[in-house]
């Protein structure tokens, strides 16, 4: 269960350190807003929307080591990696295909491809505990994944465009 943003113990996790201004976090906020089909979140700021991506150490300790991923955690995981894919597309100008496979135990893999090139491959473990200590850490992780994928595309441009 995620804690509300107004809880003073967890406001540290959504501190305004400029991380919300990164292209990755803006994209993630757009994707979260796209899931608001009833307009319930239209008055919320990006920090409030993205606060669910933070899991403090106290919350992480409360989650069992072994467990099945909850649907809301799977949605956040899907949105996070969808944002990675969209930002890679925006920066490279190439169509990116994302494959996300998760087992019932919370182990899986995410794979990003374009044409014949695998631009990013990541093994996922403990998916039921997915989250970041702060939004800054979320932005840093997402931006690093995008940079790694762009580096692969720049290293093998012929394969990426084949």
Swiss-Prot record:
Keywords: Nitrogen fixation, Plasmid
Tree of life domain: Bacteria
Xref: InterPro entries: NifX-assoc_nitrogen_fix (IPR004952)
GO annotation terms (biological process): nitrogen fixation
Pfam families hit by this protein: DUF269
Entry's family note: Belongs to the UPF0460 family.
Stated name of the protein: UPF0460 protein y4xD
Native species: Sinorhizobium fredii (strain NBRC 101917 / NGR234)
